[in-house]
Amino acid sequence: MLRWFSFGSNEGSEVAGNGWSVKPIGNMSIKKDDPVGFPQGYQCLLKVIIQLEKKDPTKSDVSELIAGWVKRYSGPHLLERLIKALIILTVPKLSRENIDNHVKLGGLFEGQVTFHFSSRDLIPTKYLSYATSIRTTVKGIYSYLSIEAELNPSSHQGTSVAKLLRASDVAKYYDNTLQSIFSQFEIKNVTITDDQIIFN
């Protein structure tokens, strides 16, 4: 089962929502008759913690901190786009905790997710964990970001990442198309079909 867990809570929320259409942009395209690609399921675990020394941080503050991580990603190459896709899913659901003069945001995504690839050579089979922590300033505000991810290959097929991205609050939170969100997170070489996202 796919669930998002709020920071400091044992209660999760399930995926809900309707699909939405997308249009081609850059190196992405939409084709109705594309092959399904090679599916690979993973048991995914992603933990995100953000701390900002500001009593009332904005979504822009969080976005700028995440953008800095996107540009400095230095983890496993084949795992990069998968982790970024999970980050896109998780950030809109981060919970908030006020502590003195700063705010802590956090969340945990856990579940079986299926990704589709245009070639078996693109399927990550090793170096499937990633962890980083960043201390920096955003608009003069001391900021901290911690990301931990682990993907374990599974013979079982879970919910496709395309369905998750379309069924969650992604479009509403980012107020943009899926292609533009991918561009923002520097997720390249992707084909978007009516019901799939294929990593090329």
From Swiss-Prot:
One GO cellular component, as annotated: virion membrane
Topology relative to the membrane: Peripheral membrane protein
Domain of life: Viruses
Name this polypeptide is given: Matrix protein
Single GO molecular function: structural constituent of virion
Keyword Membrane: yes
Gene expressing this chain: M
Keyword set includes S-adenosyl-L-methionine: no
